[in-house]
Amino acid sequence: MVIAVDNDGPRMTLAFSTLGCADLELSEALALAARHGLDAIEIRALGGTIDLATYFSERFGSPASLARTLEASAVRVCAFNTSLRLVGATSQAKEEFLRYLPWAEAAGVKSLRVFDGGNSGDAGEVAEALSTLQWWRETTDREGFSAEMIVETHDFLVQPDAIARLLEGAPDCALLWDTHHTWRKGGQDPVETWKQVRGNTRHLHVKDSISKPGPKLPYSYVPPGSGEFQ
């Protein structure tokens, strides 16, 4: 479940990530959300691929065509989820990230998710993350982009005190708070984490898990509300 914090509205926006239904086409994902009374979708994958820029180009031809399709839908898109990582952001990775911008700008998608990357949250990783954020500030100032980069607490930002160190250097950094990861992977109390991130959070990811090793992880995901996350 995805919760988008709508600072312009009276309520939170409820959505899901298409990562859980990656083979669906855009029309099918929008219909699924509508069928379950959700407000929006967060697009990570469509048609079996996470290369959304190529998917949109093949299916719609132009950003304007995608925009018309989304304008006709009662379900909106709250974010495009990219693969860029603040730590380890190569020139090629940045170029791939920028391919999302024409589609986001035309369709009025406000948020572009990136990962934090890294692992330890040490001074070197924080400095590299801040450098990538500065690159984005300079790029968006030059190009006049309206979409916002939101950083998911996925990797080094699950470490205790890492969020504070990042925000000290980038107090305007927009966050996607993965409530599960800072708790399960970082051992942090969600109440305390919220105190840190509430002023910067644009989206929340809500997941649940149990302490049973899975195929790839030391825990297993379960439907929200049926696991150990409280």
Predicted regions located by residue number:
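A short, Lys/Arg-enriched amphipathic alpha-helix followed by its capping loop at the start of a domain
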Residues: 11-14, 32-38
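Short, glycine/acidic-enriched loop or turn micro-motifs at the edges of active sites
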Residues: 45-47, 155, 181, 208-211
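Glycine-rich, proline-tolerant flexible connector loops at the mouths of alpha/beta enzymes
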Residues: 42-67, 118-121
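Gly/Pro-rich active-site loop or hairpin
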Residues: 52-57, 91, 160, 164, ...
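Short polar catalytic/cofactor-binding loops
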Residues: 18-24
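Short, Lys/Arg-enriched N-terminal segments with co-localized hydrophobic residues
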Residues: 3-11
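Active-site acidic/histidine proton-transfer and metal-coordination neighborhood
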Residues: 28, 34-35, 63-76, 86-177, ...
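Hydrophobic faces of well-ordered beta-strands that scaffold small-molecule active sites
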Residues: 12-18, 41-43, 77-82, 112-114, ...
